[in-house]
From Swiss-Prot:
InterPro entries: aa-tRNA-synth_I_CS (IPR001412), Arg-tRNA-ligase (IPR001278), Arg-tRNA-synth_N (IPR005148), Arg-tRNA-synth_N_sf (IPR036695), ArgRS_core (IPR035684), DALR_anticod-bd (IPR008909), Rossmann-like_a/b/a_fold (IPR014729), tRNAsynth_Ia_anticodon-bd (IPR009080). Keywords: Aminoacyl-tRNA synthetase, ATP-binding, Cytoplasm, Ligase, Nucleotide-binding, Protein biosynthesis. It is found in: Cytoplasm. This is Arginine--tRNA ligase. It is an enzyme of class 6 (ligase). GO terms for biological process: arginyl-tRNA aminoacylation. Belongs to the class-I aminoacyl-tRNA synthetase family. GO terms for molecular function: arginine-tRNA ligase activity; ATP binding. PANTHER family: ARGININE--TRNA LIGASE, CYTOPLASMIC (PTHR11956:SF5), ARGINYL-TRNA SYNTHETASE (PTHR11956). The keyword rRNA-binding does not apply. Pfam families: Arg_tRNA_synt_N, DALR_1, tRNA-synt_1d.
Amino acid sequence: MNIQALLSEKVSQAMIAAGAPADCEPQVRQSAKVQFGDYQANGMMAVAKKLGMAPRQLAEQVLTHLDLSGIASKVEIAGPGFINIFLEPAFLAEQVQQALASERLGVSQPTRQTIVVDYSAPNVAKEMHVGHLRSTIIGDAAVRTLEFLGHHVIRANHVGDWGTQFGMLIAWLEKQQQENAGDMALADLEGFYRDAKKHYDEDEAFAERARNYVVKLQSGDAYFREMWRKLVDITMTQNQITYDRLNVTLTRDDVMGESLYNPMLPGIVADLKAKGLAVESEGATVVFLDEFKNKEGDPMGVIIQKKDGGYLYTTTDIACAKYRYETLHADRVLYYIDSRQHQHLMQAWTIVRKAGYVPDSVPLEHHMFGMMLGKDGKPFKTRAGGTVKLADLLDEALERARRLVAEKNPDMPADELEKLANAVGIGAVKYADLSKNRTTDYIFDWDNMLAFEGNTAPYMQYAYTRVLSVFRKADIDEQALASAPVIISEDREAQLAARLLQFEETLTVVAREGTPHVMCAYLYDVAGLFSGFYEHCPILSAENDAVRNSRLKLAQLTAKTLKLGLDTLGIETVERM
């Protein structure tokens, strides 16, 4: 249930009854401090101004029309006209019961949409590096959240599988195969690409052959298509290992590489010309956009076809947006691409809108993100200054977690220890990233992310096992607990219950804004509130069975919420730590 939405509707009706316009915005928000209640309605200021009255006067009139019986125990006006709403303990108890009775914890399903999510996007014949981490895991958290809410989500892995470099790569693969070293060379993708580039730069005959191969590949020659396909297959097989290690839901079926849009490009250029949007300029085909200015203050020219007939990333991105609307029938498209690509995307989408390829009713959203930095505040690199391979980063995470877990559990069986180390190590890397606002850069710090205190994966995983341990000690049957009533009589019970019931509101924000850090902050808050509740409200030694069972049910909803919330982030939970 979305309590915020319920209160918004009630306050809005009361505002209209008090003379506010029908489109008034009640601005119901979760209260930041306990003394201001559970929710605040802050919309009186803006509406009172329009009505030419004092906000407090409007708030008083709204209260005469506001019926929150059975929902709120107290409603009061604070300051210049804020309305503070304190939820009724019996209402909280009833909602906790309903949440526990539902596999979805009472989370409702919005109108189902088809949502395309573009994320990860590694390049063929190159190993994934740390620069791919953010797009991959933030995008996947968004996908998991949207799917949980009931949307039809299409994962689009926009792999870099096309371009002039493929002539060079095919020529090098051919040379390696002639020397019976093709498979061995491809086992080290990074080395393969580096060696191919070295030959291309130093051997003119090789470079000439590579340029000819590009033409043959682009003309659809079967032999060159087969060689190209081999490069794609080997790369994606290696990438799949990384996706599986990261507990990311991408599979081979989600690959929608740049090559997919090639057949569309000539038609798009011709259509943009026919619509008068594209013109010839110095031999190239260009779209001039008034919305973007060059240094001289003139409309910026965006090239969609070069003088030599080649196409650009912008052309592909125009085709891509068109395809996602016309073929995939997207109601919404989310792009998890770093912030440096923002202007490029905005230009492509401006052309898309002007050409009528995607209507304004279908949002194209750039969910951009900042960079991962080292402790020195510079882009995260190896000690030698090279790019950090993602596989190497995950190996190190596993090794560090292994040491940490073994230290705390010296007698744990090896297989159990390995499983726990994997959950903690991979979880730590992912959570450290997901818990930061995606729009900002963040410092990558092993010590912080593997700490058992603070907003970290190990702390959250431990918090979950701590709640489960209460049930093990209680030795109670879940079915027997189901019929027990929930009683909210203590402040800490009410605070924990109210926060647990804000799970749907949190999911809604993550789905709308693409901000998994909001879920991390929520879960961390829940864990903290449970800790205070556990300390001050005895569960197993409660004064009677009714209170004991009620508190066990609050613990039960806490465990389920933590598990489900962490699952939407792609973070594994464990039963014991």
